[in-house]
C-alpha cells in the first residue's frame, strides 16, 4: 500500500509504535498527545491503529502539507491527474516563489506525484522499478482520502519543532500529563529542505521537554542519556534499482524518566 508518502514515513511501523504510545498514554493518564513532526500523519491519523487520547495535535513545518491535509479534512477534493509537464510547471513556479497556486495545490502536486516522498524531488513515473504499470499519484490520493476521518480527530498546525514554547505546553496540558511523540529527520540523511537539521539542538530540546512531559523519539541512535524502550530491524529501499539496506529503528526516552512504564 502507498500512503501519502513523506520521507521517513512511519506507516509500516505504526502497528508497533502506536500500541506503545497508547500504553504510555493510559498508564500515565495523559490528556494530550502531540505528534511534533507529524509528516504524513501516519501516527496521529492512522487508518488502522488509532491514538487513544482526548486531545491530539499534529505539528509540521511544511505549510503545504498542512494545507493539503486541511483541504482533505474540510472540503471535497476530487482526484486531479498531474502529468510530468504539469508537475514541472508547478515545481518551477514554486521554486521561483511566484505563489501562483494555492498552498494545498503545491502540496498535492509536490507530495503525491514526487518519487520516494521527497517534496519536489523528481516526478513519480507511471511504472515501478521493475517496469510494471503503476499510478503512484492515484494510489497516494486514494490513501490520503482514506485518512480523512482520522485527520478530523486531530488539530494540525504549521509549527517548527524548534519554535515550540515550553510555557505554552504547560498551558496546553494544564495539570494533566502529556505525551509528545517526535519523528525527526534522521541524522546524516537527506533533509526535506535546504536547512540542515540541528541534531544537537534537537536533543537539548528533548531534554527540556522531558522535564515536563513524556517524550518519545523515533531514531536509529541517541545520546547516552537516552535509552530505547523498543526496537525493530527494518529493510529500506535506497534507490530506484530497489537496492536495500537494514536499519534498527528505535523508540528512545530520557534515561532518568519520571513517569510509569511497565
Please name every model-derived segment.
Residues 1-45:
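S-adenosyl-L-methionine
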Residues 22-25, 169-176:
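Short amphipathic alpha-helix with an adjacent loop that forms part of the alpha/beta core around
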Residues 28-31, 53-55, 175-177, 212:
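A general structural motif
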Residues 194-262:
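Long, positively charged, glycine-interspersed low-complexity recognition regions
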Amino acid at each position: 500500500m502507498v500512503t501519502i508518502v513523506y520521507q521517513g514515513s512511519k506507516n509500516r511501523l505504526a502497528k508497533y509504535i502506536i500500541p506503545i504510545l497508547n500504553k504510555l498514554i493510559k498508564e500515565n493518564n495523559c490528556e494530550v498527545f502531540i505528534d511534533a513532526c507529524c509528516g504524513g500523519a501516519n501516527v496521529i491519523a492512522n487508518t488502522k491503529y488509532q491514538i487513544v487520547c482526548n486531545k491530539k495535535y499534529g505539528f509540521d513545518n511544511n505549510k503545504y502539507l498542512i494545507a493539503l491535509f486541511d483541504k482533505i479534512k474540510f472540503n471535497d477534493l476530487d482526484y486531479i491527474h498531474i502529468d510530468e509537464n504539469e508537475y514541472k510547471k508547478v515545481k518551477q513556479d514554486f521554486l521561483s516563489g511566484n505563489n501562483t497556486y494555492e498552498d494545498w495545490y503545491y502540496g498535492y502536486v509536490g507530495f503525491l506525484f514526487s518519487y520516494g516522498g521527497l517534496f519536489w524531488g523528481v516526478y513519480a513515473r507511471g511504472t515501478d522499478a521493475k517496469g510494471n504499470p503503476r499510478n503512484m499519484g492515484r494510489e497516494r490520493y486514494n490513501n490520503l482520502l482514506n485518512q480523512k476521518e482520522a485527520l478530523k480527530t486531530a488539530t494540525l498546525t504549521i509549527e517548527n519543532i524548534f519554535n515550540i514554547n515550553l510555557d505554552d505546553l504547560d498551558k496546553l496540558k494544564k495539570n494533566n500529563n502529556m505525551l509528545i511523540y517526535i519523528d525527526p529527520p534522521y541524522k546524516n540523511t537527506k533533509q526535506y529542505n535546504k536547512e540542515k537539521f540541528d541534531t544537537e539542538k534537537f536533543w537539548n530540546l528533548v531534554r527540556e521537554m522531558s522535564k515536563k512531559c513524556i517524550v518519545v523519539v523515533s531514531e536509529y541512535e541517541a545520546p547516552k542519556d537516552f535509552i530505547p524502550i523498543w526496537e525493530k530491524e527494518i529493510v529500506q529501499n535506497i534507490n530506484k534499482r530497489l537496492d536495500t539496506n537494514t536499519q534498527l529503528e528505535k523508540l528512545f526516552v530520557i534515561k532518568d524518566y519520571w513517569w510509569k512504564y511497565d
